[in-house]
Amino acid sequence: MSSPNRGEVWLVDLGYVAKVRPCLVISIPAWDIDRALATIIPHTTSSRRSRFEVDIKTHFLRSGVFDVQNIITIPHAKLLRNLGSLTTEQMTEVEKIMLLWLGFKDASAEEGMG
């Protein structure tokens, strides 16, 4: 299998408890010398209305959110099927929340969020 690309949404086997669900790839493609891993953000239809959830509308996803607080890294073998890709604008929206969650952006500067 070729390496997944940043911005692609894949159906991923997250195990018995977390189920098979769509996930957004946020890592860059792995090279042959790299471990075959992808960093992803799971999509959920059960929103908690957290400021770290990103609501993205696409034709290939049910209504729901990407839960940035659940960023994980998985082996490529868990990637089942490519569902589609987010637009540049949608990725920018996810990246903004991801930078806030990871502490690369000051939360006090984000007063309008929530």
Residue ranges with predicted function:
Residues 1-114:
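Conserved functional hotspots at enzyme active or ligand-binding sites that engage polyanionic ligands
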